Amino acid sequence: MSIRLLVALTLIGVLLQTGIGRADAIDGDWCSTDGMRMSISGEKITTPGGKQIRGNYSRHAFDYVVPEGEAGSSEIVNVILRSEYLAMSRQGPADSPLREWRRCKEGIS
């Protein structure tokens, strides 16, 4: 195998792995199985109730306090990325039910 081919294959492998790693982040538009929508961009979120607020962001998780005027006001919502296309959230205490979120097919307007 020539050195050029080996270098090219190595470079392609590195680029593919980098691209996959960047796609695996919680940022984006999310739709719940019960018709709710939210959008996360860094530390900003558009909540299911439509309010734009800030929360605590990490690459694979996000949490925020439910704003006034929305169901469960002042409760904490934790969102965890389970895969590139699946996230789970829990609002309130640890024994509260989980809500399933999937990446939306189109953006939130």
Where do the model's predicted regions map?
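Sec/Tat signal peptide C-region and signal peptidase I cleavage site
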Residues: 19-23
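Beta-sheet ligand-binding and adhesion/scaffold domains
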Residues: 34-36, 46-47, 61-109
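Intrinsic low-complexity, repeat-rich intrinsically disordered segments enriched
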Residues: 43-56
